[in-house]
Regions:
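Non-catalytic DNA-recognition/assembly elements of restriction-modification systems
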Residues: 1-32, 154-169, 173-191
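Residues that recognize and position ribonucleotide moieties
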Residues: 15-18, 45, 99-100, 145
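Sequence-specific dsDNA recognition surfaces
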Residues: 18-36, 45-78
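Short coil/turn segments at secondary-structure boundaries
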Residues: 35-42, 136-138
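A short beta-sheet element
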Residues: 48-49, 67-129
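"Short basic amphipathic alpha-helical interaction patches in structured regions
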Residues: 62, 93-96, 123-124, 138, ...
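A short glycine-rich beta-alpha junction/loop motif
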Residues: 100-107, 139-169
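Short, positively charged
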Residues: 117-151
Length: 191
């Protein structure tokens, strides 16, 4: 999907609501740049893009350090991987693994509930994935592309009332729940 410069950042909408920068809808906390010295055989996992895509594996690094609440991640936190190959690494996730520490190149996204619900923000970010992918591709150097805080501040969209947000979430969550059930059935059949 290709966007011109205007529609890439000024998200079109038929919804009634207030137009505001995407950045204002959440707190965006980048993970830490862990070093080999931080790693140990046990402890909490360091969550990189590979873990978001493939789960905890023998390649996952662990640490026994304590790095603060702002980079500690729990089940159902919203995460946005903003750096890497635009086609494979730029994405939005509901965190589903064990508690861990957030690595660099991933934002922990905490909804600003004054404007949006957490679930609505998740679906908005998923909807914007093609925009994020093109933004990252437009900046791609040596295989890596980025979506920066400046991009999040530049992007604007219409935010509907909380009632409309809840109606949208009801429809999309029902579909997501069905997909999850089918995925679990497929996983059990494959096992």
């Amino acid at each position: 999907m290709k966007f011109d410069e205007s529609s890439l950042y000024n998200i079109k909408s038929d919804l009634d609501g207030i137009r505001c920068p995407l950045f204002d809808l959440a707190a965006w906390k980048n993970g830490l740049a862990f070093k080999k010295i931080d790693f140990s055989e046990t402890g909490r996992p360091v969550i990189k893009i590979a873990e978001l895509n493939n789960g905890i594996s023998s390649n996952t690094s662990f640490t026994q350090g304590d790095y603060g609440e702002d980079v500690y991640i729990r089940r159902d936190d919203l995460l946005f991987s903003w750096s890497g190959n635009p086609q494979t690494s730029i994405d939005v996730f509901r965190y589903r693994l064990q508690d861990g520490w957030l690595n660099q190149h991933i934002f922990k996204v905490t909804a600003n509930e004054e404007f949006v619900t957490k679930d609505f923000l998740y679906y908005v970010l998923k909807y914007l994935k093609p925009h994020f992918t093109q933004i990252a591709a437009n900046k791609q150097t040596t295989g890596l592309g980025h979506v920066t805080i400046a991009d999040l501040k530049r992007m604007s969209l219409v935010v509907p009332s909380k009632e409309v947000q809840e109606q949208i979430v009801l429809v999309l969550k029902a579909i997501d729940d069905k997909i999850e059930v089918n995925k679990n059935i497929n996983d059990n059949l494959a096992a």
